[in-house]
């Protein structure tokens, strides 16, 4: 249970394309960075993890381009808060592309090219961090009620509709 990385409906995803969700993913990425020392990185997803990784990679002297499907970075917060973050990223050298829906990752002799990413630049390293989705299969099979996006429905005490079964975190439907 918990959550798993969302998968984008991209063609061309394979070796050399990374996600960051687990410690194992982190160690794989770290090994890739040490072994290959990429100079240009593309990060698809400008949420918290994407922004943190953009900062971490720029500290390693990697040129970073950050691609966001929506009109602002951190789409979960108000635009008046996201704009200064966008500006700070730009000031540190991150190329921020908003309203950029990447539809394909093409491997070329000179690196990876993002189709729909608003640039023809190629990259040595690609990271896809577009959020998570509930990993509710076990609870669904047990009969738990879920939403259309498979988040487990709970009450104010975090109880599911199943006797003595509680759920919390990325797995459950949130109420804002």
Please describe what each predicted stretch is:
Residues 7-15, 66, 70, 176:
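Acidic/polar active-site rim loop that often engages polyanionic ligands
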Residues 40-42, 48-104:
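Rossmann-like dinucleotide-binding cores of NAD(P)H-dependent redox enzymes
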């Amino acid at each position: 249970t918990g959550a798993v990385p969302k998968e984008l409906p991209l063609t061309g995803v394979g070796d050399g394309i990374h996600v960051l969700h687990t410690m194992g993913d982190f160690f794989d990425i770290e090994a890739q960075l040490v072994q290959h020392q990429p100079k240009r990185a593309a990060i698809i997803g400008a949420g918290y993890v994407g922004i943190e990784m953009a900062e971490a990679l720029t500290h390693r002297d990697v040129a970073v381009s950050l691609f966001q499907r929506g009109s602002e970075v951190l789409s979960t917060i108000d635009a008046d808060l996201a704009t200064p973050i966008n500006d700070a990223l730009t000031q540190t050298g991150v190329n921020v592309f908003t309203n950029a829906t990447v539809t394909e990752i093409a491997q070329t002799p000179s690196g990876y090219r993002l189709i729909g990413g608003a640039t023809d630049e190629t990259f040595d390293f690609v990271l896809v961090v577009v959020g998570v989705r509930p990993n509710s299969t076990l609870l669904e099979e047990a009969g738990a009620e879920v939403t259309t996006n498979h988040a487990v429905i709970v009450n104010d005490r975090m109880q599911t509709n199943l006797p003595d079964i509680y759920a919390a975190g990325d797995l459950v439907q949130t109420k804002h």
